[in-house]
Amino acid sequence: MSAADAEYRVRHQSFWFVACVAVLVAQIVTEYLMGRVPICACGYVKLWEGGVNTSGNSQHLSDWYTPSHIIHGFLFYGLGYLILRRKPLAARLLLALVIESGWELLENSPLIIDRYRTATIALDYYGDSILNSAMDTVFMCVGFFFASRAPVALTVAIAIFFEIFTGYVIRDNLTLNVLMLIWPVEAIKVWQGGV
């Protein structure tokens, strides 16, 4: 590779990474304009919120739903690999960020907040803080980069472990969350209420 080719490649990658940062900034600004609270209404920031059905859930840096966002990164890396295989990694990351940021904006809209409150056990869910939502997106990026480097079997094993572990501990995980949002099952709702 010539010096000119290397310089072009760096500049091209830089464009994609700047676009990625712009998506995250747009997500944060949009959530602010939607009236989302910047941080937990409690007035402080925790590294980890271990309560599930508490007012602090989805308000701090990480929580029991963080593994779900890491799995999003695994899945979105796979999607990007399938449809943008010839594009740079940063272009695939941009696709992942657009999907994740779009989900975060939808998840924090009145439509989805009300759906969570009526169809799932999340009766006290009022949406994420901007900080938590941004960190959800960052954790998706962590999963994305992990999947880009790790063997597929390891990535799949970690995703399965996350699903089983969070399902066991909090009776919720990515699979159950999607199922209960799209097609609520009363028996699962009752089981989840036993936490």
Swiss-Prot record:
Its main location: membrane. The lineage of its organism: Bacteria, Pseudomonadati, Pseudomonadota, Alphaproteobacteria, Hyphomicrobiales. GO terms for cellular component: plasma membrane. The chain crosses the membrane at residues 15-35, 64-84, 127-147, 150-170. This is UPF0314 protein RHECIAT_CH0004233. InterPro entries: DUF2585. It is found in: Cell membrane. It is a multi-pass membrane protein. The keyword Protein biosynthesis does not apply. It comes from the Bacteria. Keywords: Cell membrane, Membrane, Transmembrane, Transmembrane helix. Pfam families: DUF2585 (PF10755). Belongs to the UPF0314 family. It comes from Rhizobium etli (strain CIAT 652). HAMAP family: UPF0314.
